[in-house]
Amino acid sequence: MPLPKHLPALGGMRFISALLVFTSHISTQPFFKNTEINSALQFPLNRLGPLTVSFFFMLSGFVLTWAGLPDKSKVNFWRRRTVRAYSLHLPVLLVTLLIVLALNEPNMGRSVWDGLLTNLLLIQAWFPDHHEYGSMNPVAWSLSCELFFYAMFPFLFAFFTKVRTDRLWRWAAAVSVAAVSIPLVALLLPASPPLPWDPDMPQLRWWFIYMFPPVRLLEFVLGMLMAQIVIRGRWRGPRPLACVALFSAVFAVTFAVPNHYDPGALTVPVIALLLASVAVGDVRGVRSWLGTRTMVLLGELTFAFYLVHYLIIQYGHRFAGGKQGYYRQWDTPAAVGLTLLAFTLALGLSAFLHFFVEKPVMRTLGRPRRSPDAGSTPRSEPAPSGTP
């Protein structure tokens, strides 16, 4: 069976994950004056939102492997991926800097200039200091990881394409075990100081588990392996609904695991199964609501949506009457309305950035160049997955 160039259902999944990130960040700035509603939102979303990071990193590895390296040029690949990442990161960073300077309020920084250089170079995730990775536009830390993944991808791709087909599942299992074990390794790190926003979590351990690019590379590699399994016709896993049920069961178990372990690590293998099972549906021509034109379009907007949504929530709340360190709260109807307004603004701005900034930049600077050993056409040219 010939493999399709595009996997539309994965685009739909990308947007659903971005929506979870949005609602998770909404819950951290409680709009609702009703404390019961705030608690009901925060209880699952504070746990579910970060899990989308695993999905996005796996998705990135999956779609890049699906596209492959058609011209076999590492330099061309690195250039295209860097241009695509910076096409939106730079303008959003500039707007963020202007807002921070206008308000004279650093975002987790000690001064308004904290983190500017590391954010500009997208190396903030390499520093175990929340004044760096939490400064400016805090969600951009994941792009710091993505650039590291891009740097490693040509070498990893060359290696895994040579792995024997009958050993792919063993590799996937080994990487899954490694990812689940990372919180145990983190216990070797100092237990103090704690995170400013979570006194029960040591700052260095949290950075190592959640931010450190080589650690998050495991999820990217797992996505690559699942793509190889699907490409080579070795998928024998459960269907999407069964994967969703399995994820729900494991997710419920995570609430019984201490926070300092990072319970979300337990869901990594299940997310990998869900990702591959949805992709297999596309390969087999199974129609899904995730693959409709609307969902695919929303998926294309996800990178821009991810980069702007937190700024709209954070500073929208600030301009609506909140102050630094204080989140104004509203009655339920007003809070619902403001949440919908924030989502609408984020989606509208992401559409503008995608069509009038990202795409023109890619047409001008990100166009593939022919190399002497150019090969076949890629199955697709994936966008940055976007992460919380």
UniProtKB/Swiss-Prot annotation:
One MF term in the entry's GO annotations: acyltransferase activity, transferring groups other than amino-acyl groups
GO cellular-component term (any): membrane
Biological process annotations from GO: antibiotic biosynthetic process; polysaccharide biosynthetic process
EC number: 2.-.-.-
Keyword set, alphabetical order: Antibiotic biosynthesis, Transferase
EC top class, as a word: transferase
Superkingdom field: Bacteria
Region annotated Disordered, chain positions: 366-388
Pfam families for this protein: Acyl_transf_3
InterPro entries: Acyl_transf_3_dom (IPR002656), Acyltransferase_3 (IPR050879)
Biological function: Catalyzes the acylation of the mycaminose sugar during carbomycin biosynthesis. Recombinant strains containing care can use spiramycin as a substrate and convert it to the hybrid antibiotic, isovaleryl spiramycin.
PANTHER family: ACETYLTRANSFERASE (PTHR23028), ACYL_TRANSF_3 DOMAIN-CONTAINING PROTEIN (PTHR23028:SF53)
Name recorded for this polypeptide: 4''-mycarosyl isovaleryl-CoA transferase
